[in-house]
Amino acid sequence: MPRKGPAPKHAVVVDPVYGSALVTALVNKVLMSGKKSVAERIVYGALEGAKNKTGNDPVVTLKRALDNVKPTLEVRSRRVGGATYQVPVEVRAGRSTTLALRWIVGYSRARREKTMTERLMNELIDASNGLGASVKRREDTHKMAESNKAFAHYRW
């Protein structure tokens, strides 16, 4: 264990176009091999496409999508006397946002549309409407936590 205490949190830079820290976080999740300008082009294109398709503010669409994908419970493995139990625990706010962004980007990469911009746009629109693979992932996570509720007393 480190003796210095927890590492300091970095100040999140707000996005220059939309003025939102969530857009910056999404750009950083899409980022691959240090190509930030490519990631920004993908995210801005997806948000602009979502604005054209839905007619809503793209940041509102992103927030609604994140709210529909954020998990409140997850399972953690806990070893007790030779057996490993899946123990349901509550997810902290920062982790739930990070997981939601990770799932949205991951499942948009797995979609079948031609460009990443289209894939991300459609996944964001689906997630904001309560559809899509990332929302299903959240439901599966909650279902797993619900089915392992009997082991909740092993929480630490």
UniProtKB/Swiss-Prot annotation:
Pfam families: Ribosomal_S7. GO terms for biological process: translation. One of its GO terms (molecular function) is structural constituent of ribosome. Keywords: Ribonucleoprotein, Ribosomal protein, RNA-binding, rRNA-binding, tRNA-binding. The keyword rRNA-binding applies. InterPro entries: Ribosomal_uS7 (IPR000235), Ribosomal_uS7_bac/org-type (IPR005717), Ribosomal_uS7_CS (IPR020606), Ribosomal_uS7_dom (IPR023798), Ribosomal_uS7_dom_sf (IPR036823). Signal peptide: none annotated. It comes from the Bacteria. GO terms for cellular component: small ribosomal subunit. Part of the 30S ribosomal subunit. Contacts proteins S9 and S11. One of the primary rRNA binding proteins, it binds directly to 16S rRNA where it nucleates assembly of the head domain of the 30S subunit. Is located at the subunit interface close to the decoding center, probably blocks exit of the E-site tRNA. PANTHER family: RIBOSOMAL PROTEIN S7 (PTHR11205). Belongs to the universal ribosomal protein uS7 family. This is Small ribosomal subunit protein uS7. The gene is rpsG.
